[in-house]
Amino acid sequence: MSRKHIASEALLKNIQVPQGDKTYEKILDAGLALFVEFGLRRTTMEDVATRAGIGRATAYRRFADKDQLIQVVILRECQQQLAMIESDLEKVDDGLERVLESFVLAVTRAHRHPLLKRLLTSEPETLLPLLTQRLWQMMGFFRIYLAGLLQVEQDNGAIRQQPMEPM
């Protein structure tokens, strides 16, 4: 697996995102915008549907409930952030340096992300349960991403061989 596709592969193993469904994308975009603006608690599915320019029933046909929408929005944001990190890493030649830089970039981007900043300032009590209980897929996503990144660097001889299975 090339470095360019690690994030996409990790995401696809954890959640099925319909490709080319413009309405689905509009719902995700509206959800993200409203979650950043008003927080998770204050945003309703009706708010999201209105912002997306669709009916509430259409939103519910694509997402069973707000929790599912939250999960998909966050997973999509993770995938997009990791894709940007992978793009930045293309400029780094040394494999070990690439692994270290990936961690630095991930932490930096996380601290600057508007949704994470919103949750930390207005709903900190929801963040830990969200990440550990409701977004268990995200842990799998990061595990697959990290294992893929390390495997590529092992294959390139940049870091020593270790089995990735424990990850």
Where are the regions that the model predicts?
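Basic, helix-initiating cap at the start of DNA-binding domains
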Residues: 1-38, 42-51, 67-71
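C-terminal peripheral helix-coil segments that are non-catalytic and often amphipathic
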Residues: 1-14, 108, 140-156
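Amphipathic, non-transmembrane alpha-helical scaffold segments
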Residues: 20, 28, 70, 74, ...
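Short hydrophobic/aromatic patch on the recognition helix
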Residues: 53-63
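Amphipathic alpha-helical packing segments from all-alpha helical-bundle domains
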Residues: 79-82, 127-156, 161-166
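Short linear capping/connector segments at secondary-structure termini
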Residues: 87, 120-129
